[in-house]
Swiss-Prot record:
Coiled-coil boundaries: none
Keyword Manganese: no
Record keyword Ribosomal protein present: yes
Protein name (record): Small ribosomal subunit protein eS8
Gene (UniProt): rps8e
UniProt KW keywords: Ribonucleoprotein, Ribosomal protein
Gene Ontology cellular-component annotations: ribonucleoprotein complex; ribosome
A GO MF label: structural constituent of ribosome
């Protein structure tokens, strides 16, 4: 777990004296790191009793073609580009904004696989 609260140290190196300890709502989670493979999702309970679905592995993407206005479920071949991190291309990690190669051609991911549990993409020319 990652604690995302305020630092205990000042910029000068001095110490802040906290009026309270760490709280559960200040804890973050490790990233989903969605890769290409047989679809595997994980459901997580979040604040307010709601749920988030994390895509840990994904085999297919819902690709939308702007010209025809149709959406097709297509197999993902590989990750071509990822502006979030160049190392993600080597590891085939998929995030929002990543460009993937599919059976229809190149497509850009518009959903957040680590939050939505699915990969929605738009075909690019």
């Amino acid at each position: 777990m990652l604690w995302q609260g305020k630092s205990v140290r000042k910029a000068t190196g001095g110490r802040y004296h906290a009026s309270r300890g760490k709280k559960r709502f200040e804890i973050g989670r490790s990233p989903a790191d969605t890769i290409i493979g047989t679809t595997r999702v994980k459901t997580i309970r979040v604040t307010g009793g709601n749920t988030k679905v994390r895509a840990l592995r994904c085999e297919f993407a819902n690709v939308s073609d702007k010209k025809t206005g149709k959406v097709q479920k297509v197999k993902i071949n590989s990750v071509a580009e990822n502006a979030a991190n160049p190392n993600y291309v080597r590891r085939n990690l998929m995030t929002k904004g990543a460009i993937i190669t599919t059976e229809l051609g190149k497509a850009q991911i518009v959903s957040r696989p680590g939050q939505d549990g699915v990969i929605n993409a738009v075909l690019i020319e």
